[in-house]
UniProtKB/Swiss-Prot annotation:
The keyword Transmembrane applies. Keywords: Cell membrane, Glycoprotein, Membrane, Phosphoprotein, Postsynaptic cell membrane, Signal, Synapse, Transmembrane, Transmembrane helix. It comes from Mus musculus (Mouse). This is Protein shisa-7. Glycans are attached at N26. Disruption phenotype: Knockout mice show a decrease in miniature inhibitory postsynaptic currents frequency, but not amplitude, in CA1 pyramidal neurons. Mice show impaired acquisition of contextual fear memory without affecting auditory fear learning or anxiety. Decreased long-term potentiation of hippocampal glutamatergic synapses. The gene is Shisa7. The GRID (GABA(A)R-interacting domain) is critical for its subcellular localization and interaction with GABA(A)R. The PDZ-binding motif interacts with PDZ-domain of scaffolding protein DLG4 in heterologous cells. Residues 1-22 form the signal peptide.
Length: 558
């Protein structure tokens, strides 16, 4: 009985000394931390043996000194108490909850502070009190679980194990942990996003307001530009002597004079009508009258009062308009560039036309290429008495529309251009006038062709007339082919009409030149027609001209 009391007292002391004892050290060696746990284990074994019905003699002093083999067998029969692994933060910042090592023989919490697991060897047991990763790291935001894990006590009769409430100072069991910096971090992100959005909105609004503010003065300035231009032109043109000019140049009431009608502001400050051809007075770019830095506006008197703005004349420098927008000067410079390019194009066309014209020289023994020639040009036929198209009644249509070449537009009116070798107006007789002439005119033309050569001193010779008629007949008949007419000879009635214009009588010129030899005309046999004008195209190498060539491609007669 005294032995039982002694054992009970020792067991109570051991259970009381458990919670109040010091923290276990970090020593994980196989040696027990002190003699008290071994003594308690020995006492538990003895208590179990006594409860099993052992004799009282086994409680002697020799019974406490058992062999090691018998101690190991008793320990194998009674498993050690389960150990609790406390919750911790691993190397990834994740919180691992508390777990209890109570499965099989895995009764001890082993491993490291950042990686814990259950094991069955006591010597591998981890001293959890020496670890410091129980609080949230600064860089981790994962909150711990709201409720701490519940740890069970050890075996029967065991005290509170490590990890239970009160085992660590400021125990974490049951404590609700909050994520460190969760509130401030989230609010900071929202604040930053709000500030950026507000700054963007303010910038866009400021840009829109600045653009509107800058656009309004520009529009006002553009509206005032025509008025300033009109004022400048009015002052440079001198005092307005004509009332209509004063009325047209004034944009405010009261400037036209007492006797003028009440002026009003025009609907359009610019002239919407096309200026007349009289305003297009251009000068050659190379001439001293046309300089790139001088604006010279010269206009004829206006045909109607509606062209007031186009009739303002001034001969001033560009520097007087320097305060105006650059669009005026740019427009004038572009016009100058266009005129220069047109002048170069005209020179090129004139050179090509001159070269082609020189290549069209007639070979010997052929008929002339042109239907008419100017008086005195020669060419194998005596045409001294020919008249112009106006005298022959074959003049072109009245008022022909002519597109003037670039040399005419840009050339100086006071001197002839170096490229002025275009065909005269008398040469520009269309083919239709030749083909549509009357049969009477054709007959007179053939009679004129077969007449003897004219001479102011010698009368006509019948022998010469017969030889000329025979030569023309042979030419028209041709070698073994259809009769072909002459090409390029003077048209019908040229000599008779010209002589009538000069002397006032319709008789042929060779009769008057010969001194009135009427017998020769009576004895001359009538001419038999050998061909028509429609057969001109059958003459080899001589075709009807499809168009009249001029000195420039830009000059066209309609």
């Amino acid at each position: 009985m005294p032995a039982l009391l002694l054992l009970g007292t020792v067991a109570l002391l051991a259970s009381a000394a458990g919670p109040a004892g010091a923290r276990p050290s970090n020593d994980t060696s196989s040696v027990a931390p002190g003699p008290l746990p071994a003594l308690l284990a020995h006492l538990r074994r003895l208590t179990g043996a006594l409860a099993g019905g052992g004799s009282a003699a086994g409680t002697s002093a020799n019974a406490t000194k058992t062999s090691p083999a018998s101690g190991t067998g008793a320990a194998a029969r009674a498993p050690p108490p389960a150990e609790l692994c406390h919750g911790y933060y691993d190397v990834m910042g994740q919180y691992d909850a508390t777990f209890n090592c109570s499965t099989g023989s895995y009764r001890f919490c082993c491993g490291t502070c950042h990686y814990r697991f259950c094991c069955e060897h006591r010597h591998m047991r981890l001293a959890q009190a020496s670890c410091s990763n129980y609080d949230t790291p600064r860089w981790a935001t994962t909150p711990p679980p709201l409720a701490g894990g519940a740890g069970g006590a050890g075996g029967a009769g065991g005290g509170p194990g490590p990890g239970q409430a009160g085992w660590l100072e400021g125990g974490r069991a049951g404590g609700a942990g909050g994520r460190g910096g969760e509130g401030p971090g989230g609010s900071t992100a929202y604040v930053v996003c709000g500030v950026i959005s507000f700054a963007l909105a303010v910038g866009v609004g400021a840009k829109v307001a600045f653009s509107k503010a800058s656009r309004a003065p520009r529009a006002h300035r553009e509206i005032n530009v025509p008025r300033a231009l009109v004022d400048i032109l009015r002052h440079q043109a001198g005092p307005a002597t004509r009332p209509d000019r004063a009325r047209s140049s004034s944009l405010t009431p009261g400037l036209g004079g007492p006797d003028s009608m009440a002026p009003r502001t025009p609907k359009n400050l610019y002239n919407t009508m096309k200026p007349s051809n009289l305003d297009n007075l251009h000068y050659n770019v190379n001439s001293p009258k046309h300089h790139a830095a001088t604006l010279d506006w010269r206009a004829m008197p206006p045909p109607s009062p509606s062209l007031h703005y186009s009739t303002l004349s001034c001969s001033r420098s560009f520097h007087n308009l320097s305060h105006l927008p650059p669009s005026y000067e740019a427009a004038v410079k572009s016009e100058l560039n266009r005129y220069s390019s047109l002048k170069r194009l005209a020179e090129k066309d004139l050179d090509e036309a001159y070269l082609k014209r020189r290549q069209l020289e007639m070979p010997r023994g052929t008929l002339p290429l042109h239907a008419l020639r100017r008086p005195g040009t020669g060419g194998g036929y005596r045409m001294d008495g020919w008249g112009g198209p106006e005298e022959l009644g074959l003049a072109p249509a009245p008022n022909p529309r002519r597109v003037m070449s670039q040399e005419h537009l840009l050339g100086d009116g006071s001197r002839a251009s170096r490229y002025e070798f275009t065909l005269p107006r008398a040469r520009l007789v269309s083919q239709e006038h030749l083909l549509l002439s009357s049969p009477e005119a054709l007959r007179q033309s053939r009679e004129h062709l077969l007449s003897p050569p004219r001479s102011p001193a010698l009368p006509p010779d019948p022998t010469t007339r017969a030889s000329l008629a025979a030569s023309h007949s042979n030419l028209l008949l041709g070698p073994g082919g259809p009769p072909t007419p002459l090409h390029g000879l003077p048209p019908s009635g040229l000599h008779a009409h010209h002589h009538h214009a000069l002397h006032g009588s319709p008789q042929p010129a060779w009769m008057s030149d010969a001194g009135g030899g009427g017998g020769t005309l009576a004895r001359r046999p009538p001419f038999q027609r050998q061909g028509t004008l429609e057969q001109l195209q059958f003459i080899p190498g001589h075709h009807l001209p499809q168009h009249l060539r001029t000195a420039s491609k830009n000059e066209v007669t309609v």
